[in-house]
A protein has these predicted regions:
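A generic, well-ordered mixed alpha/beta core segment in the N-terminal half of proteins
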Residues: 68-136
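Condensing-enzyme catalytic core mediating Claisen C-C bond formation in acyl metabolism
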Residues: 1-26, 124-205, 209, 242-264, ...
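Conserved active-site "lid/cap" helical segment
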Residues: 1-55, 59-65, 190, 198-215, ...
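Short beta-strand segments
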Residues: 56-57, 106-112, 147, 293-298
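Short, well-ordered, mixed-charge alpha-helical segments that flank or form enzyme active sites
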Residues: 63-64, 114-119, 180-184, 229, ...
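Active-site-proximal alpha-helical scaffold in enzymes
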Residues: 34, 81-108, 147, 268-289
Length: 334
């Protein structure tokens, strides 16, 4: 579905085989994340030996897609779990590590796969369960990027890079760490509703902490609220006197042609926010088309055990401020 969606022309790689040449869905997702990481490192003009550490995660138990996928690269590894907010978690920790001087280059990556997510959290694919209209479709995709201590120079890179454009580059200039927000939702098939309160909290705190209004951002982009979650987010922010409708977009709504592709409320999964960020958003920031963006990946915190025991589904959302910085090198000179 992703390769036929609205963003198909922006992806670096589209694989027609959902198994990625592997024998299991889990191995397929590991291979996909490894490919994304390899692409990101190569586009930065680096090798795995140049990467000080990697922050990566996924939706599977014990984050096996990430650990198995990154293992062959030989990079010091931190495994993360933030559900579908994992890309925001990895970018936050990567930015902190770089700014603290713990590494010149940090790799951030995540992935999701429709089949592995269904197997992990819902029903076997052969069961053919009917999905409610509030449900989202897990994106089969992966995204990775390299955070550097120094501005990337497009003059020195062997080819184009989403982080180094002739007009400038994308930089992380601030973060708002998400809180676990429990609104008492129990419907795991309405994850947009579960995550919207967390997105509201993070966006509201970001605007307060940085003394900004929604208009100070060219776009506020949430991870995977979908149509249902977007409406709930607007209502919750309206109660706080904030209207972001003119600048809001959602990665879950950008990933598919919802009606034509029958994805109901939209897309979801770790790979949803990650693939939209790396394929579509970062190049637009690097080129200067977008000057300042608040990127807010959202996650629904649950497991098979917590759901079966009747626990509510909490949400979390991490805010990442991404800004366009003019290129440090003009006219082909560093």
């Amino acid at each position: 579905k992703e390769g036929s969606g609205p963003l198909k022309e922006y992806f670096d790689m589209i694989c027609e085989d959902s198994m990625f040449g592997e024998k299991t869905w889990e191995s397929a997702e590991s291979t996909m994340q490894k490919e994304a990481a390899t692409l990101a490192i190569g586009k930065a003009g680096l090798t795995p030996r140049d990467i000080r550490m990697v922050f990566a995660g996924d939706l599977l138990a014990q984050t096996i897609a990430s650990s198995f996928g990154i293992a062959e690269m030989g990079i010091p590894f931190y495994g993360l779990y933030g559900a579908c907010s994992t890309m925001g978690e990895s970018l936050s920790l990567g930015a902190i590590a770089v700014s603290a001087g713990y590494g010149a280059h940090i790799l951030c990556a995540t992935s999701s796969h429709f089949a592995t997510a269904e197997k992990e959290f819902r029903f076997p694919l052969g069961y053919g369960s009917q999905r409610p209209l509030s449900a989202t479709w897990t994106v089969t995709g992966s995204g990775a990027c390299v955070i550097g201590a120094k501005p990337p120079c497009s003059c020195s890179l062997p080819g184009s890079s989403p982080l180094a454009h002739t007009n400038g580059y994308a930089a992380i200039t601030g973060i708002t760490t998400g809180k676990v927000i429990d609104f008492g939702f129990h419907d795991s098939l309405n994850m947009g509703g579960c995550m919207a309160p967390a997105a509201c909290d993070t966006i509201h705190r970001n605007l307060e902490d940085f003394s900004r209004s929604p208009e100070d951002y060219d776009a506020i982009i949430t991870g995977d609220l979908g149509m249902v979650g977007q409406h709930i987010l607007f209502d919750l922010l309206a109660e706080k006197g904030t209207d972001i409708s003119s600048v809001h977009q959602d990665c879950g709504l950008l990933s598919y042609h919802n009606q034509a592709q029958d994805t109901h409320s939209g897309g979801s999964g770790c790979g949803c926010a990650a693939s939209v960020l790396t394929a579509w958003l970062l190049p637009r920031i690097a080129s200067g088309e977008l000057k300042r963006v608040l990127f807010v990946p959202t996650g629904a915190l649950l497991s098979k055990v917590s759901f079966n025991e009747g626990a509510p589904v909490s949400g979390i959302a991490h805010g990442i401020i991404l800004e366009h910085i003019p290129s440090p090198c003009k006219g082909g000179k560093n």
